[in-house]
């Protein structure tokens, strides 16, 4: 099973990515000024999955290991457990998608080179 620290390291290897702690115990990965991964307490990771329809397809695919993210789920964010249920290569794909979606929303001047 991959640890939260290892997933955070994977997130931070992305161009322009950096770690922030906007609240006590809240660990997030950002690109520019936008969050692309919520790592929280290490038991789960919140990721942008596209529009709500795309996010709902992932809820069906990972039933029991994924849920709509509180407060922002209606905007296409899901939370995925980090208990090993989701294979590491698929989790990397989910992180890559979240990063790519967030970078696409950044103004061109703030996008990583």
Model-derived segments and spans:
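Charge-dense, helix-prone N-terminal extensions
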Residues: 1-113
